[in-house]
């Protein structure tokens, strides 16, 4: 169903052809192609690594699967630990102009690191409360009415 009322079927067909040409860039031939191989020499170490991964894949061994099955990568704090180790800060960049949206204009408590720290503090307070205030449970004897 068209949202435009055309005077004739010919006008509608012409409009559809024009829309299709606009989508294709006003040409029947696409404007993209696979680029030529680079002229520079190939890094031999990189080529060896790629060939090794291709051999492993042919044997049914997939790098991603091996990583996901590795017990060391099941740590929920792994990303935080790696970011700390490599001194990587939280990404706060954007392609949008700052007058429209400034990603650095948030309060520090909205970022993941601050939220994680806040959660850790809450858990510590709860555990501390449970340790110190629940050392004994006081019972009262029941009294029968007379």
Curated annotation (Swiss-Prot):
Pfam families xref list: HCNGP
Gene Ontology terms: biological process: meiotic cell cycle; negative regulation of gene expression, epigenetic; regulation of DNA-templated transcription
Compositionally biased residues, Basic and acidic residues: 21-32
Organism: Schizosaccharomyces pombe (strain 972 / ATCC 24843) (Fission yeast)
Function of the molecule: Has a role in meiosis.
Start and end residues of each stretch annotated as Disordered: 1-40
InterPro entries to which the protein is assigned, alphabetical: SAP30BP
Name by which UniProt lists this protein: Meiotically up-regulated gene 151 protein
GO cellular component: nucleus
Keywords: Meiosis, Nucleus
Domain of life according to the entry: Eukaryota
Keyword Metal-binding included in the entry's annotation: no
Compartment list: Nucleus
């Amino acid at each position: 169903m068209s949202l435009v009322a055309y005077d004739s079927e010919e006008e509608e067909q012409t409009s559809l052809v024009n829309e299709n040409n606009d989508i294709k860039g006003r040409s029947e031939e696409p404007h993209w192609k696979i680029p030529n191989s680079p002229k520079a020499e190939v890094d031999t170490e990189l080529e060896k690594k790629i060939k090794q991964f291709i051999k492993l894949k042919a044997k049914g061994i997939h790098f991603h699967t091996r990583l996901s099955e590795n017990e060391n990568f099941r740590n929920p704090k792994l990303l935080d630990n790696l970011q700390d180790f490599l001194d990587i800060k939280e990404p706060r960049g954007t392609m949008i102009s700052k007058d429209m949206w400034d990603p650095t204009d948030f309060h520090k408590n909205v970022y993941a690191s601050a939220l994680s720290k806040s959660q850790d503090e809450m858990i510590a307070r709860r555990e501390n409360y449970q340790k110190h205030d629940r050392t004994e449970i006081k019972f009262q004897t029941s009294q029968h009415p007379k």
